[in-house]
Amino acid sequence: QRALRTAKQAKDEIAGPLRIVGPRSAFQPVLWPLIDEFCQRYPDVVPDVQLEDRVGNWVEDRVDVGFRLGLSPHEGLIARRLLPVQLIICASPEYLKAYGAPETIAALQSHRCSAFRNPGTGQIVPWRLRSGNDEVEQPVVPAICTNDETLELSAVLAGRVLGQLAGLTAAPYIRAKQLVPLLVDHIPDRYSYFVYYGSRNAQPARARAFIDLVLERLVDNSKYVLSMKE
């Protein structure tokens, strides 16, 4: 009985390592404020954060809480939707002054575009756009190609290229008038960000507390989602 009580107390104590995994691309601006707030609340928790764009093995990687963008994650795990993934074609005012704005999807072929190379697969990720009720993949001829989202953002801000950026990344720059959203009627709406985890009954208290904070702070938070007016 004493051993069981000790084990239960250890499980219910909000302390110890917290293994978090998530995508390297597009999610860092959201994740750090959550971790910072959580650690201020619970200073005895030690976050172990692994960011990579591959989909790992939940058991082998000993994950407590995971994040993913795209469609709903693995079967056998609990997944909660957080935010829509807005993929927004953006340009700086300097780019638009020099090259003008594309008025149609087809016009992208005559513009200088950035391309993102998936760090996990090495493949260039096509731009995804909504066309009517369908989603289409739009290949672009890249003027710059990179597997680093920060470098891609820098190239777009500098006025060198158009880029299709995640809304989480682009939103503060659009609101500050440093970037202009283009072809907004073609922003796809199929994908979302998810938090996922195993059975709540088997979770340590630190994982349950972090998930509760994530849901409280992120679910459809307008700070991270641009409205059509914006």
What are these regions, as identified by a protein language model?
Residues 20, 38, 125-139, 173:
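Ligand-binding cleft/hinge of the Venus flytrap
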Residues 16-75, 227-230:
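Central regulatory/effector-binding core of bacterial HTH transcription factors
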Residues 153-178:
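A ligand-binding cleft/hinge motif common to bilobed small-molecule-binding domains
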Residues 47-51, 115, 137-148, 186:
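Short beta-strand-to-loop elements that line the ligand-binding cleft
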Residues 40, 44, 167-176, 186-230:
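C-terminal effector-binding regulatory domain of bacterial HTH transcription factors
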Residues 79-82, 176-188:
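Short beta-strand->loop
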Residues 1-12:
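Alpha-helical "hinge/linker" immediately C-terminal to small N-terminal DNA-binding modules
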Residues 76-87, 91-116, 132:
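Flexible hinge/capping segments at coil-to-helix
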